[in-house]
Amino acid sequence: PLALVLSPEADKLNPKITKNFTDLYGPGDMAEAEALRYHGSQLIGQAAPLLPAVVLRAERYLRCGFMGMDVLANLVNMAKTQGLYTIVDARTSAPEVYTAGGIHADGVTVTPYPGSDVCRAAEDKSVFAAVRTGNPSAPEIQSLMSGDRRLYLAAAEQMARHGAALMAETGYSLDVKELRARAPRAFLLLLSCDGENALPAFDDYGRGALLGDDTLQYADADAIQAAVRQLKQLVTVL
């Protein structure tokens, strides 16, 4: 299973798209937000027939203020309408902001460190605890020892015990192996992880994890199809 990750950087968007909205609205948050809306809507349309889910990085939209929030809500609704499972990567301590309110995503990433309070969600919603993040300074805290395991693994155990799925940003198979060993029944959302390094996350039937690919957001439909084929080939080797 492969998810489209939308975490767009303004300077990587098609310059023609950016220029069109800048000409229309003038430079500023509105032009950038509308460029992100167009970019996201086109990709969701391409991905919907091929992929099961989309992950939207909240901060990339909220940089545009209230217009960015409107775009985020609009893209979530658009993706759901086209049959995609929607996850907002917010790393929040208040999941209901993204699973209820005006956004109504199917799932949301949360920070695990406030404790089990962040695992509370409606029955039809999912919470993904961001136990391993990919920012450069993450190991300063997440790799500290807590008893016989690193802190992020201790957090993973606790979050899984309270019913949360787990999110990890890692390109290392050892991290995935350790995470799966500590939380054998948890569903894993793996970002920035290729299919080969993610193999330990899957069971013998190719289930138990979802990979998120942020390179597809700058690719065309052919690239999405190629990524799906490659992952299917890897997983069926199990």
Residue ranges and their predicted role:
Residues 9-10, 14, 20-22, 27, ...:
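Conserved anion-binding
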Residues 1-71, 80-81:
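Conserved N-terminal beta1-alpha1 strand-loop-helix module at the mouth
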Residues 47-104, 173-178:
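N-terminal active-site wall of soluble small-molecule enzyme domains
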Residues 171-215, 219:
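A C-terminal functional module that forms or caps the active site or interfaces directly
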Residues 1-5, 52-55, 85-87, 107-109, ...:
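Structural preference for beta-strand elements that scaffold enzyme active sites
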Residues 207-238:
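C-terminal functional extensions of proteins
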Residues 32-47, 95-101, 152, 198-199:
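Short, acidic/polar
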Residues 44-50, 74-81, 120-124, 180-183, ...:
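Acidic (Asp/Glu)-rich catalytic clusters
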